[in-house]
Amino acid sequence: MASGWRGYLEEESEYQWIAMTGFLIFILLGAVAIQGTSNLPGVEFGSSDASHAGTRVLDIEYTSDTAFTAKVVTGTGIDLYMQTESGSVTRIIDSSSSSDAGEMQFMTTLDNDNVVVASGENTLMVIHDPKNVANGEVLISTIQLDNSTGDFEIADLAERTSGSSTSWLMVTNEGSSMGLRGFGSISEGATSPDTIASSMATSILSTATDNTAGVVWEHVASLSDGLWGASGYLTYATTAGSSPATPTIVPVVAVIEWDTSINAPTIKTMYTGDGGTIHSLVQLSDSTVFAAGTQGSTYIHEDGEMTHFDDGSVAAVADNQDRVWLFGDVGSKTTVRYHQGQAEPLSLARGLTFETEASGFGTHQIFLHGTDEQGAIQTLTIDTSAPGSIESGRGFLNFMFLGVFTIVMVVMAWTAGERLLGAKFR
């Protein structure tokens, strides 16, 4: 190919124009072809081949593309189980044995890959990842929190690790209101079921936040040492005399301070939106938090400052590069990807065909789980390593274009150089 181009370029000028015109046509055709492959690659719709295949997934926490803890609907009720890397399954809560996971409101994957859930008033259950257990089994530790300041249910939990110590912030149902409580500090021995009790021997449970603002807290996430993100909502009557059955609901995003003492967490700053709800608080590895809402989103910086965006969604997932992917409702043909404050709309080959009920990220893949209008179980997976790779159509065309462009430019430079040198020594 190089010798052919060189031959054209060494001919009279009209052949050079033919060569340049051909190259221009190649550029235009390449641009059209690249635009034609602009749909996001690595996307698959359909049923899943995981252990939850055919069952409705209500909540799921991934530790890799093949390992997760899932809350699913079965023929006897709602179960909670863990699937390991090897594909083995351990039932944590089995509805066929008179227990049920229906009251479980959250699952949080800790930094050590253990998963913590609430199992009753003042009670947490830590599901130890097999790699944290000497014999490689899935073991469970039950943590009974101090009830000297009252009984409470736990609706969400976030973790903050600083050096060798860890602290937790929890959303708690105090009976008459929703509150926030801290628990810590916890030593590094909490990883193993053999030493988790001793690691919490000196841990302190704080009192509950005085909720004079009337916020219904729902989610928490770690920001930096001493700072946390929290979200929830406020309700109020739209006009005097309006029905209490149809109040106005507005979303709330707040920055919370807690010093790992018995003192209650306090609200540092609070933002109230115009409408919708915050469905996800996405904790990022750079000590920032992305609050994704149905009518807008908020980025909470490490120092607690907030930046607000207009993009709404029904599900949000962060990948291993701290890119937050926002997904819309049924029929949505795009996803918006946020990274370092920049939004990038990405086209899907076809619209979402189901309502998302659970989502997560493994090692390289994003997973959305839900049911379609016919009640069929559906899963959407996105391989985040596919865009721009040589395996994707767009990546291949980009590679081919760069290759041909490089060959042409090298040949043209080579020929021009030879002519210049020849003219110099004549």
Model-inferred region functions:
Residues 1-40, 389-426:
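Secretory targeting signatures
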Residues 77-84, 122-128, 175-189, 236-255, ...:
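Structural motif
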